[in-house]
């Protein structure tokens, strides 16, 4: 007897692990679906059901044995479920057609049997969004001292010793605002005006016929929105976990039926830290996005039905074919020709020794030159082997967490691309200047964009023949600029690149350094030839500008004079945290414990304090013990490499005294 079918047209907006039914060997996923009809505004709910094999049942971890923590709960179960999810053909079809509207083919019981893409339908489908802001106080029970773990991070130790309190929740929807605080008295909570949590989330029950019986599945539903934005700090402060735990209890604890599972993995569970978002593969069964809310249209934005990337850090997925699948790596055979091109480490940092003079760690070009900067990572992502790798996965991460076969593929394509561009530049009479991981710099004779245009077209053809699509323009994979002087250096322990712009017409051919006349920090005078106080937003940018100035100055120019020009800028920005943040590679000394466990988030940036480098976040007030002297000494060191001069001990003493005086100035509140 034929089973009657139903259909629904629209967009899949999420697939969630609902439950496992051991007695009938069934796993159930919840499918959130948005109908094409804009008048049908609420999320619809359907289900994908699969039968578990004996082997899958034997491998299934017991969730009862998992003890929830601030950072994770039932991680092994999430890893087990992910392997099954990636094998289910209905879910695989939904993932492959995620950018398109689809038609779901279902049984009467809302069980999805097939997913049919509709490529010719492009109806705009705006998504309703809500915003959840979670704050909490994180306190250490024991002060943490000593060196960080082998990973260079402190968050694991902090989470073991900390307490989460004073949780504040604010959830803003189109229908109003829900808010609560963990330390509020019950009377205050009742009297507070605004939405109740039951106005935001409700519980729906679906009776699903499965394996000859009817299962009552409980599902969370948000009538007012499709997507929930959450503030960035919720990734590490523990408040979101507590909110969703309480919400799960509120919705399902007194209802008959099977609720969705409650499991999660937050960045704090990753020993070395991660750039990937938290994973909540089951409850709250709604698309989660982190950061400042923006409007979303399902028909026009790139959409992932689930983002389990954080699991690739853990055994069971790390460096396995499952990790490759999660990343979107498409394995293809690599030709024998590519193997012959494997010469460069991936990625590599190097300076053309033929451009170096006194040291093989620094090259200075003191003649007008065109400079072409090629974004190798962007170009590699146009290659057929790597084009399907998720945009949220950097190639550095791919090299670290993927299979040896995937890593080998990246290395071969990296070498193939480098060989292509370097061979082309040599054949055209150009010189490569430096390679810094995923960026290549080379010098060209063209000084104007019009002169470079024919060369670009020829390079584009060469890349295309090698399997790479060079776009240029606003795509960011290639940038042309023209300079009077250039510097490339690794002498400070990290790569520095600076170039002074060429003079423009009417300037008599003199260099045109990037500086303007501007007011002082109090607005009551002028500092002639001082850098624009609004011109840079980070200390590293000011460092580059100091080098540019040094390249343009006579050899006998005082180093202190060059630094003095940026002191007004430093004073203006002295209490601005984001200005002083730098990578750990630019720091000196052993990192010290941060005040909060946000070093679980990558990439990590640091403030150099008098105790040592400290991982820090731009949104927090500057530490009181910033080591401004370190930043001034690094600026001096950068300038000195451009114009080395002989100085007597008296000059050295004068420089020390002046740097200390500027340090006292910057330390003023």
Curated annotation (Swiss-Prot):
Native organism: Human herpesvirus 8 type P (isolate GK18) (HHV-8)
Lineage, top ranks: Viruses, Duplodnaviria, Heunggongvirae, Peploviricota, Herviviricetes
Protein task: Component of the helicase/primase complex. Unwinds the DNA at the replication forks and generates single-stranded DNA for both leading and lagging strand synthesis. The primase synthesizes short RNA primers on the lagging strand that the polymerase presumably elongates using dNTPs. The primase-associated factor has no known catalytic activity in the complex and may serve to facilitate the formation of the replisome by directly interacting with the origin-binding protein and the polymerase.
Keywords, alphabetical: DNA replication, Host nucleus
Source organism superkingdom: Viruses
Name of one Pfam family that matches: Herpes_HEPA
Record's protein name: DNA helicase/primase complex-associated protein
Matching InterPro entries: Helicase-primas_cplx_Herpesvir (IPR008650), HSV_HEPA (IPR004996)
GO-annotated cellular components: host cell nucleus
Location within or outside the cell: Host nucleus
Annotated spans, Disordered: 502-526
Oligomeric form and interacting partners: Associates with the primase and the helicase to form the helicase-primase complex. Interacts with the origin-binding protein. Interacts with the polymerase catalytic subunit.
Gene Ontology process terms (BP): bidirectional double-stranded viral DNA replication; DNA replication
Family the entry assigns: Belongs to the herpesviridae HEPA family.
């Amino acid at each position: 007897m034929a089973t009657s079918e139903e259909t629904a047209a629209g967009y899949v907006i999420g697939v969630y692990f609902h439950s496992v039914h051991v007695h009938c060997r069934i796993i159930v996923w919840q499918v959130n679906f948005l109908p094409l009809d804009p008048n049908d505004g609420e999320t619809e709910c359907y289900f994908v059901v699969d039968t578990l094999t004996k082997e899958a049942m034997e491998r299934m971890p017991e969730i009862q044995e998992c003890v929830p923590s601030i950072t994770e709960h039932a991680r092994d179960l999430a890893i087990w479920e992910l392997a099954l999810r990636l094998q289910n053909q209905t879910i695989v079809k939904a993932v492959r057609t995620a950018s398109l509207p689809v038609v779901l083919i279902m049984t009467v019981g809302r069980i999805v049997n097939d997913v049919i893409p509709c490529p010719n339908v492009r109806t705009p489908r705006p998504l309703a969004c809500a915003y959840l802001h979670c704050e909490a106080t994180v306190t250490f029970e024991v002060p943490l001292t000593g060196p960080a773990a082998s990973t260079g991070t402190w968050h694991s130790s902090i989470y073991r010793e900390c307490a989460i309190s004073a949780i504040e929740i604010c959830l803003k929807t189109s229908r109003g605002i829900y808010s609560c605080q963990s330390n509020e008295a019950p009377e205050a909570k009742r009297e507070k005006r605004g939405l109740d949590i039951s106005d935001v989330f409700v519980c729906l029950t679906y009776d699903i016929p499965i394996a000859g019986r009817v299962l009552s599945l409980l599902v969370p539903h948000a009538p007012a929105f499709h997507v929930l934005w959450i503030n960035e700090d919720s990734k590490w402060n523990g408040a979101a976990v507590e909110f969703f735990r309480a919400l799960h209890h509120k919705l399902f604890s007194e209802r008959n039926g099977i609720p969705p599972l409650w499991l999660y993995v937050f960045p704090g569970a990753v020993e070395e830290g991660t750039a990937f978002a938290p994973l909540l593969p089951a409850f709250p069964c709604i698309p989660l996005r982190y950061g400042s809310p923006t409007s979303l249209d399902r028909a026009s934005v790139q959409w992932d039905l689930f983002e389990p990337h954080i699991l690739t850090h853990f055994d069971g997925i790390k460096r396995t074919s499952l990790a490759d699948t999660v990343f979107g790596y498409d394995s293809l055979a690599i030709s024998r020709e590519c193997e012959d091109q494997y010469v460069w480490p991936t990625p590599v940092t190097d300076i053309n020794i033929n451009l170096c003079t006194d040291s093989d760690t620094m090259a200075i070009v003191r003649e007008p030159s065109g400079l072409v900067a090629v974004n190798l990572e962007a170009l590699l992502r146009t290659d057929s082997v790597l084009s399907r790798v998720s945009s949220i996965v950097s190639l550095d991460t791919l090299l670290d967490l993927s299979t040896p076969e995937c890593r080998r593929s990246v290395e071969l394509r990296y070498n193939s691309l480098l060989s292509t561009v370097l061979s082309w530049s040599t054949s055209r009479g150009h010189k490569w200047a430096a390679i810094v991981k995923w960026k290549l710099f080379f010098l060209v004779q063209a000084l104007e964009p019009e002169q470079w245009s024919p060369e670009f077209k020829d390079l584009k053809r060469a890349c295309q023949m090698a399997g790479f699509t060079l776009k240029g323009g606003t795509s960011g994979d290639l940038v042309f600029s023209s300079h009077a002087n250039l510097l490339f250096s690794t002498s400070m322990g990290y790569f520095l690149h600076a170039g002074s712009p060429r003079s423009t017409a009417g300037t008599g051919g003199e260099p045109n350094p990037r500086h303007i006349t501007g007011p002082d920090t109090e607005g009551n005078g002028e500092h002639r030839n001082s850098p624009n106080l609004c011109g840079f937003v980070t200390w590293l940018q000011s460092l580059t500008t100091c080098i540019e100035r040094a390249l343009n100055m006579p050899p006998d120019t005082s180093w202190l004079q060059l630094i003095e020009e940026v002191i007004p800028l430093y004073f203006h920005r002295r209490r601005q945290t984001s200005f002083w943040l730098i990578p750990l590679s630019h720091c000196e000394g052993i990192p010290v414990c941060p005040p909060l466990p946000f070093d679980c988030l990558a990439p990590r940036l640091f403030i150099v304090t008098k105790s040592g480098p400290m991982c820090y976040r731009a949104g927090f007030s500057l530490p009181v013990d910033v080591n401004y002297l370190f930043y001034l000494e690094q600026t001096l060191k950068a300038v000195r490499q451009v114009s080395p001069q002989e100085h007597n001990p008296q000059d050295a003493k004068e420089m020390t005294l002046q740097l200390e005086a500027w340090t006292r100035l910057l330390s003023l509140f």
